[in-house]
A protein has these predicted regions:
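Primarily recognizes the serine-hydrolase "nucleophile elbow" in alpha/beta-hydrolase
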Residues: 127-197, 214
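Short beta-strand element of the alpha/beta-hydrolase
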Residues: 67-75
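N-terminal cap/lid segment of alpha/beta-hydrolase-fold proteins
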Residues: 20-64
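Short beta-strand/loop motif that positions the catalytic acidic residue
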Residues: 231-234, 238
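Mobile cap/lid helix-loop segments that gate and shape the active-site cleft of serine hydrolases
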Residues: 43, 188-222
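C-terminal catalytic histidine-bearing segment of alpha/beta-hydrolase fold enzymes
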Residues: 247-298
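Catalytic nucleophile-loop/oxyanion-hole region of alpha/beta-hydrolase
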Residues: 82-83, 89, 106-143, 276-282
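Short amphipathic alpha-helix adjacent to the substrate-entry channel of hydrolases
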Residues: 84-102
Length: 298
């Protein structure tokens, strides 16, 4: 009986988690109409795997006046999406400080579902920015304060958008800019070369990726003076994604005159989300101060 009740509760939680996702496109680009194998599991954290149909969940901070909006890309090595502690939980925090949030359920790269799997997540991120600006009036969003945020591989996706916003991969409405106004990256994968997270690279590009593609997705190589301002957080003892990823990205940003701030923890490892339990210091508070300093919020 207890096992039955536990199963029902788990299913109920999962239904609540997924009921809010809306279609990202009218017609999905770069898509093979194969059986949808999306699945989910709760094992300490909520994970979504095999996403082939992208979606979004919009969390409103109120409709009294236009507010900033952050698009959140959960991490998961381009294999799964940690959609709760790196997604919906973060969205609720942003709402508490007067920022709308959109959690992006981006596609997991798959040869079964995409003719060109390596660009599918970037297409979804570009579309998400476009969508927010399309609905700016209805959703009470300030279209000049639309940011992108990502954790781990989601940070790679977010930074890919930040440096490749001018390489349009979608055909929805090219009159609307897909350039984010700011970026927030949590223990991000940045480079696909020296400091690469091999799993993320293989899942996105495949085992036989070319040097040109690895360079394209080594985002520190594509920073320029028009790259959006950035806030990053990383722990020195991260054994999954070395902190050097954040170091080289911040160096590239500052070398190009782009405002960037890196919050460094001595410990914390990888995947701590909003709260690093090994430290009394709050990177979330530092991020809020950074948002205020850059006049994104008051």
């Amino acid at each position: 009986m207890k096992k039955y009740i536990s199963t029902i509760l788990t299913l109920s939680l999962m239904q609540l988690a997924f009921a809010q996702y809306n279609p990202l496109y009218k017609k999905i680009p770069n898509y093979i109409d194969a059986p949808d194998e999306e699945s989910s599991a709760i094992d300490g954290v909520l994970r979504i795997s095999k996403v082939s149909i992208p979606g979004y969940a919009f969390f409103s901070a109120g409709n009294d006046d236009p507010k900033p909006c952050v698009i959140i890309c959960p991490g998961g090595g381009y294999r799964i999406l940690a959609s709760e502690h790196e997604g919906t939980d973060v969205a609720k925090y942003f709402n508490s400080i007067g920022i709308h949030a959109l959690v992006l359920k981006y596609r997991i790269p798959s040869d079964d579902h995409q003719p060109d799997k390596k660009i599918a997540p970037l297409q979804d991120a570009q579309r998400a920015v476009q969508l927010v600006r399309e609905h700016a009036k209805d959703w009470k969003v300030d279209p000049k304060k639309v940011g992108i945020m990502g954790f781990s591989a989601g940070g790679h996706l977010a930074s890919s958008l930040a440096v490749h916003y001018d390489d349009i991969k979608i055909k929805e409405n090219n009159k609307i800019s897909v350039r984010p106004d700011f970026q927030i990256l949590g223990y991000p994968v940045i480079s696909f070369s020296k400091f690469s997270h091999v799993g993320s690279r293989k899942n996105l590009l495949g085992k036989d990726s070319t040097e040109s593609m690895m360079n394209y997705f080594s985002n520190e190589l594509h920073v320029n003076s028009n790259t959006p301002i950035a806030f990053l957080v990383h722990a020195k003892d991260d054994k999954v994604v070395p902190i050097e990823n954040s170091f080289i990205y911040v160096d590239a940003l500052k070398s190009n005159g782009v405002e960037a701030e890196l919050f460094v923890y001595e410990t914390g490892g990888h995947g701590f989300g909003m709260i690093n339990k090994t430290s009394s210091e709050s990177w979330i508070n530092a991020m809020k101060s950074w948002l205020q300093k850059n006049k994104i919020i008051q």
